[in-house]
From Swiss-Prot:
Physiological role: Binds 23S rRNA and is also seen to make contacts with the A and possibly P site tRNAs.
Keywords: Ribonucleoprotein, Ribosomal protein, RNA-binding, rRNA-binding, tRNA-binding
Family: Belongs to the universal ribosomal protein uL16 family.
Subunit structure: Part of the 50S ribosomal subunit.
GN (gene name): rplP
GO cellular component: cytosolic large ribosomal subunit
HAMAP family: Ribosomal_uL16
NCBIfam families reported for this sequence: rplP_bact
Name of the protein described by the UniProt record: Large ribosomal subunit protein uL16
Annotated organism of origin: Cereibacter sphaeroides (strain ATCC 17025 / ATH 2.4.3) (Rhodobacter sphaeroides)
Cited PANTHER family: 50S/60S RIBOSOMAL PROTEIN L16 (PTHR12220), LARGE RIBOSOMAL SUBUNIT PROTEIN UL16M (PTHR12220:SF13)
């Protein structure tokens, strides 16, 4: 699964996801893409599940690009532990996704296969998405 090799700090504040994507909102690599329409944290497991669903439907044809990276550590405390005594340990890694962000791009397959593959990948994600085609702009 995806996670940073090293970070400057082990833990981060939760923060909030404000506004729309300032970058990464155009198709740069493939002809079809999956665009987020709402703000949410997407975990490394969810990204990997979506990638597997997309590549499985494409039957190893074409190419898939993952345009988001889980670089935010999410901490949690063990069950039945009282509040206080410091912040919990890192549980998983997540990517903060803003509306308008392209998350996946694919190329090298027909439009029907591409749309179905992206639809299957979108089912694995916790946010609503749109399928965009390069001819849209």
């Amino acid at each position: 699964m995806l996670q940073p090799k090293r970070t400057k700090f082990r833990k981060q504040h939760k923060g909030r996801i404000h506004g729309e994507a300032k970058g990464g909102f155009l198709l740069n690599f493939g002809g079809f893409g999956l665009k987020a329409t709402e703000p949410e944290r997407v975990t490394a497991r969810q990204i990997e599940a979506a990638r597997r669903a997309i590549t499985r439907h494409m039957k190893r044809q074409g190419r898939v690009w993952i345009r988001i990276f889980p670089d935010t550590p999410v901490t949690s405390k063990p069950t039945e532990v009282r509040m206080g005594k410091g912040k919990g340990s890192v549980d998983f890694w997540a990517a903060k996704v803003k509306p308008g962000r392209i998350m996946f791009e694919i190329d090298g397959v027909s439009e029907t296969i591409a749309r179905e593959a992206l639809r299957l990948g979108a089912m694995k994600l916790p946010i609503t998405t749109r399928i965009v085609v390069r001819e849209d702009w």
